[in-house]
Amino acid sequence: MSNLIADWRDRPTHRRVWALAAPMILSNISVPLVALVDSTVIGHLPHAHQLGAVAVGASLYTFLAWAMGFLRMGSTGFAAQAAGRGDGAALRQILLQGLLLAMGLAIALGALGIPLSGVALHFMQPSAELDQLTREFFHTRLFGLPAALASYALVGWFLGTQNARAPLAILLSTNLVNIALNLWFVLGLEWGVVGAARASVIAEWTGALIGLLMTRKALRAYSGHIAWAALALWQSWRPLLAVNRDIFIRSLLLQSVFFLITVQGARLGDATVAANALLLNGLLLTAHALDGLAHAVEALCGHAIGARDRDALRRSLVVACGWSLLASLGFAVLFLFAGHLFIEMQTDIQNVRDTAFVYLPYLAALPLIAVWSYLLDGLFIGATRAREMRNGMLLTVILLLPFAWALQGLGNHGLWITFLLFMVLRSATLGTIAWVLRNNDGWFAGRVH
């Protein structure tokens, strides 16, 4: 206990955590603000199926894009460890490899996205109006996929070098452009649901181009040159691809859970899927704010592991954990006492509001339950322990399935209870793995890349 108190009182660690976390919290919060603006603008159109189309279409797009989240996570861990070693050549190679992977994956996903969306909508069994608008929204969003994946790689690389200002510039520019164009296209030009999708596409390309322009200045701090010949060798790609493979499997499992919630909600009716979308915007707001602290954990823990500094690793975790717990408590209180205002702000469709109000207590409980999984993700990403993340998520989903099946009869209440249980299991499995690694000094054993 005395060690924990001493670590918490270490002012330099607080400064390092917040130097990274504050810009990332600001930029991360802008991400769910876009979803909030989408929901608010579309939610004030006359029909529930219009809001439902944005919710389902965005869920389809997010399933594809966020499954590629390994582009950010893998880049962060390797870049942080390279920065800890002062290896400029490795930093350049990691950046280029991340961008090349992003482009290749965007092309493949763009080709697969349309038929996969048709299959998904078939299983959802939406109304005819919801089906048509969802397809139009999703097909338009696919044009922004290359830029979105490139931004993942860029943000991850910048975070690994402990540069939080560049991700702030990328994400803020993306999301502010999205908000402005959303208001113009949907309300001004009256393009409706497709207008919201077009705004997102233009915004994603804006952010990616800004990020590319900022890499040149960032690289000046690290001397070195790209070993072009090494890019043609399998050995230079193998560590990154191995980590990315495992994070991809983990991300796919995670996004499958979120996607299945949308699918099951759609089967319960247009009002239910719309209400769940509004509530999940609250989770997005919480998750992206807490992820700012988790991103600090990624960079600081990865740097400490690269420098083989056990004390710095422990102090970073203690300080980030303390602030994350305080923030999650704040969000829980906010949703408990001001949740109705949060819902009313997003839509004036009365049956959607009434449905969402019923499930507000679940949203209030989520931050306190989910915070631990976000922090542990940051630790494992910084340590490039992707295999353990994959195994933890696989075990979580396996343990969750029988509960999800048993709770089907409870309707949307069963859906939310399942989701809360998913977050509990996710934290428990990763926490157990982290405890085993700590006891075996596994965070430092053979982790130099």
In which residue ranges do the predicted regions lie?
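Short alpha-helical transmembrane segments in multi-pass integral membrane proteins
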Residues: M1-A21, A79-P146, V177-A180, V186-R245, ...
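Membrane-helix interface/capping residues of multi-pass secondary transporters
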Residues: S39, A48-L51, G88, A164, ...
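A late C-terminal transmembrane helix in Major Facilitator Superfamily
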Residues: L363-Y374, G378-A404
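Small-residue-enriched core segments of transmembrane alpha-helices in multipass membrane transport
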Residues: L171-N178, N281-G282, P361, L394-F403
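Alpha-helical transmembrane segments of multipass membrane proteins
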Residues: L36-T40, A111, V119, A153-W157, ...
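Small-residue-rich hydrophobic transmembrane alpha-helices
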Residues: A53-A111, A148-Q162, A166-P167, A275-F337, ...
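Helix-loop interface residues and adjacent transmembrane-helix termini in multi-pass membrane transporters
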Residues: L36, L45-A48, A82-R85, G160-T161, ...
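Transmembrane helix-bundle signature of multi-pass secondary active exporters and lipid flippases
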Residues: I25-M73, G77, R141-A148, R238-H303, ...
